[in-house]
């Protein structure tokens, strides 16, 4: 709410390229779910962000 906006922030189709730093900057949702590269099994918002939130505490729960 630094700028007074209290709504939901969502990226454009595959426009985000970071998980933790994007979440900490205020991104609430990436618009295109799925893998970073086709059928790679890795994603910016999937497992890595979950680990950062629940396992190592990199992303605070309030974010």
UniProtKB/Swiss-Prot annotation:
SUPFAM superfamilies recorded:
(Trans)glycosidases
Active-site residues, as the UniProt record annotates them: 12
**Which reaction does this chain catalyze?**
Hydrolysis of terminal, non-reducing beta-D-glucosyl residues with release of beta-D-glucose
Entry GO MF terms: beta-glucosidase activity
The record's listing under InterPro entries reads:
Cellulose_deg_GH3, Glyco_hydro_3_N_sf, Glycoside_hydrolase_SF
The first-level EC class reads hydrolase
GO annotation, biological process = cellulose catabolic process
Give the sugar-modified residues. Answer: 48, 56
Name the Gene3D superfamilies on file: Glycoside hydrolase, family 3, N-terminal domain (3.20.20.300)
In what pathway does it function? Glycan metabolism; cellulose degradation
Per the record, the domain of life is Eukaryota
Instruction: Give the EC number.
Output: 3.2.1.21
Q: Name the keywords, alphabetized.
A: Carbohydrate metabolism, Cellulose degradation, Glycoprotein, Glycosidase, Hydrolase, Polysaccharide degradation
Q: Which family does it belong to?
A: Belongs to the glycosyl hydrolase 3 family.
Q: Know the name of this protein?
A: Beta-glucosidase A-3
Q: Which organism is it from?
A: Aspergillus wentii
> Upper taxonomic classification of the species?
Eukaryota, Fungi, Dikarya, Ascomycota, Pezizomycotina
